[in-house]
Structures are given as C-alpha cells and as structure tokens.
C-alpha cells in the first residue's frame, strides 16, 4: 500500500475530467479500504465520529465554541492531536434541529402532502437554521416535513478516516429508514451535497450497500424544488425588496453529480439576485482532510485560486451546497457563505407562495 494514496482528497474531479469515465477516486478509496494497515488514530476517530462529537459539543455549546477559539487550546490540539492550529472550527448550536423539530412535528403532520428529510450532522448540530429554512419553503409550498425514523451520519468522514465497517453499518441503518419513508409515499430530501453523493453513489460503489431502490427517491432539496417548479407542481413567489449579489461555488461532489444547475437556476428565479458562477475549483478542505496538520498547507494551496477570485468579485455572499466548503471559504476569505436554500427562504414571499400553492 502506497501511503501517498492518502493525499487523495476524494474530490472526484479526476473522474469528472476522465473521458473514459474511469472511476479513479473510487479505485483509490477501495485500495485504501482494502490494503491500508494503519489503524485510525484518536484524532481520526474524533474527526470521523461526527454524531458522537456533535452530541457532546452541542450540550456545552457556549463553552465548546469559546474553547475551540482559544489559541492555547488550538496549540494543544496541534501538538497532541495534530489538528492544525490555524484551522477554524465550526460553531455548535445549543439546541439541535431534532430538538426543535419535536416541538413542531404536529404542525408538519397537519399538511396533506409530505416529504422526508435527512438533515445530516451539520444542519442538526452546527446550523439548525438551514433545516428551518427548508421547512419554511416547503411549508409555503404546501408540504409538511417528516424526519426519518432513525438517522446516522452519512459516513463520509468515517470512510475517509479508515472506519469503513462503521460507515457501512450506519449506511445500512440510513437506507432502511429511507425505505420506510419511501414506502409511506415520501421522497427523501437533503440539504448537503456531500451527504447526498455519499448515500447515492458511495454507498453502492465503496461500501457495497444495495441502494438501487432508494436512490431514485433521494434528492438534494434544490434539485427536487427545481423539478417541481418546472413541472408546475409548485410555485414560488419572491419579495420585490430582496437584492443580493451572489457568487456560486460548485462543490466537488456537486460537480460529480452534475446537479449545480438546479441550485443556480433556482437562485436565478429570484428577481433581485445577481449571480456569478465561480470558476471550477476545489476549495481544498475535503471534509476532515484540511483539519489535519500534515494536510493544512496543501489544503489552503489547493483553495487559493478560489479564494482569490472571491475576494476580487466582492459578492455580498458566496453560495454553495456543501457545508465544509462554507467553513473553508469563510475562514479563508472575508465573505460569508450561505446555502442556496437559505437564500431562497430569505427571499421568499411566504404569503404569496402559500396563496399560489393553496397551502
């Protein structure tokens, strides 16, 4: 096993570029799973187990967020855990989305039509507002939102850190939960491009999880919304006083799926949005990759062209469908980053949208 294979970010850009459709990144990941003899370190296990860490961190969110920003704490993590001291950690929310949702579940059941929602780690532990933004849009369109019976992290960080057996167990649980939702007549939506790609493609290709029956019903929320609008099944109305200059970054896994068009076309439906598509570049963080001391400089060098273009454009916000891209861009530029769903929710004329959809 060549340890240099660990330098692969699994961004899939080699697969996008390959004219023969060779799944190069999959071959590298399969080799890492099969032949790597190195046991995951404590650092790698911590970075990979997002559900466990998120559960601990959110319960002490104010303290956690304060501590993770202290230079002495960063220095200790750098020297002991080899998590680079220059890396900025995402903040945690004291109230998770699941906790918030329990108080509103009855309201969601009152709708005649429903979708199921896989929120993932970020929209649960770090930024529940993204999940709330999705509910705002779907409710205005006449759809209630149900959570899955059970949900675990999609497992992308587990695979990247040598814990593929655990990733497979979590993947099987997620697929079984989605099957129940689909059997009830609900499509399953997500708000993370990486979660979507992992469950749709990596489960089958890397973890050998049978998901053929689930994949057609699993979609990124922007893709589902765009297709529903185009088919005339839902209508969106937007505020006349909303104006923003946005720069859209196509996350690597979004590019591999070919789904950026859905997010950008939805954003273009907002009359007050001036949208610029950023050049096709990886931001460099690749999930947990950019947190590791041995990768940090390389991570920042990979993202440098993207950061430069963003600073030159000076948008009001950067838009992207990937949460780790958001962390990297916000840390490395002067701009804040929003998921397209959050922009749509902010721009939405809720009352008019409800009227148009008879919600």
Regions found by a protein language model. Give the residues of each.
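The −1 position to Zn-ligating cysteines in a subset of zinc-ribbon hairpins
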Residues: 7, 14-17, 153, 282
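Iron-sulfur cluster-binding electron-transfer modules in prokaryotic oxidoreductases
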Residues: 24-359
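Ferredoxin-like iron-sulfur electron-transfer modules
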Residues: 1-10
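Conserved aromatic-histidine-acidic binding/catalytic patches
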Residues: 6, 15-19, 122, 126
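CheY-like receiver
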Residues: 13-25, 29
């Amino acid at each position: 096993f060549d340890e240099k294979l660990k330098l692969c970010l699994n961004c899939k850009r080699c697969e996008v570029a390959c004219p023969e459709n060779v799944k190069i990144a999959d071959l590298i990941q399969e080799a890492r799973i099969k032949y790597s003899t190195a046991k995951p370190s404590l650092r790698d296990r911590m970075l990979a187990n997002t559900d466990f860490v998120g559960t601990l961190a959110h319960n002490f969110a104010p303290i956690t967020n304060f501590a993770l920003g202290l230079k002495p704490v960063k220095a200790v993590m750098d020297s002991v855990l080899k998590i680079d001291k220059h890396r900025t950690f995402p903040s945690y929310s004291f109230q998770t989305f699941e906790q918030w949702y329990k108080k509103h579940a009855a309201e969601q059941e009152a709708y005649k039509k429903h979708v199921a929602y896989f929120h993932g780690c970020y929209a649960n532990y770090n930024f529940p507002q993204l999940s709330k933004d999705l509910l705002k849009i779907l409710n205005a369109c006449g759809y209630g939102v149900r959570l899955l019976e059970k949900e675990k992290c999609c497992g992308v960080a587990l695979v990247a850190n040598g814990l593929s057996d655990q990733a497979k167990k979590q993947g099987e649980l997620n697929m079984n939960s989605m099957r129940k939702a689909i059997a009830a007549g609900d499509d399953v939506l997500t708000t993370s491009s990486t979660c979507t790609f992992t469950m749709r493609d990596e489960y089958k290709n890397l973890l050998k999880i049978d998901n053929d029956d689930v994949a057609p019903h699993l979609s990124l929320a922007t893709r589902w919304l765009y297709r529903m609008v185009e088919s005339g099944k839902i209508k969106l109305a937007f505020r006349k006083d909303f104006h923003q200059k946005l720069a859209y970054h196509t996350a690597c896994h979004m590019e591999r799926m070919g789904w950026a068009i859905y997010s950008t076309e939805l954003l273009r439906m907002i009359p007050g949005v001036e949208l610029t598509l950023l050049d096709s570049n990886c931001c460099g963080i690749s999930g947990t990759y950019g947190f590791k001391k041995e990768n940090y400089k390389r991570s920042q060098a990979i993202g440098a062209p993207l950061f430069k273009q963003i600073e030159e454009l000076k948008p009001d916000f950067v838009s992207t469908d990937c949460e780790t891209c958001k962390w990297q861009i916000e840390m490395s530029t002067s701009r804040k980053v929003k998921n397209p769903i959050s922009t749509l929710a902010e721009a939405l004329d809720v009352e008019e949208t409800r009227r148009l959809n008879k919600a």
